[in-house]
Amino acid sequence: VDSLPVVERAWSNWAKGRGLDVQQVLDFIHGKQAITSLRHFMPGASEAEIQREHAVLEQVEAQDTDGVHALPGAAALLARLNTLDIPWAIVTSGSVPVATSRLAASGLPRPAVFITAEQVQRGKPEPDPYLLGAERLGLAPQACVVVEDAAAGILSGLAAGCQVIAVNAPADAPKLDQVALALSSLVQLQVGKLAQGARIDVVR
């Protein structure tokens, strides 16, 4: 799901309201849980104050879906996985209200395994979200392929021991040399079924 316009709109307004450098905030937040970013930029605040701020920001992000859409190739890829009976999950740094709202706006199907911020103590770039996703799928992390566009997500997938495909990731994202594939679009992915697992081909 491409929610970049919504994310940057919400956080830009939040940064301006607190007199913070907007670009500095935007450079930090991508792929991370909102609560992680709030704790980073509100170092002198109490946890209660941070939680109140989070509740307000969460409501803003959940209600604003203008510009949210499925990435090119995402719907076809998920349909192909379902046709081949290959299990898949969504592992997001968004909370339930935010992630549910954006998924609905994108028109993509909701998976059986949907990992959100509330389900892990440590979010991306820590490995916990993808470790939980693999566990819920009933697979070893090494048997899972993570598709990510954010630096924090790439680091999380690698730390979990998954194979990572970076799609339209920032050129300066760390550890890009360790990902299995680096692509510009999901349209380039073609998936086939093997006796055990899946085969991924790339259309250049």
Cite the ranges covered by each PLM segment.
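A generic secondary-structure micro-motif detector
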Residues: V1, Q24, G67, A89-T92, ...
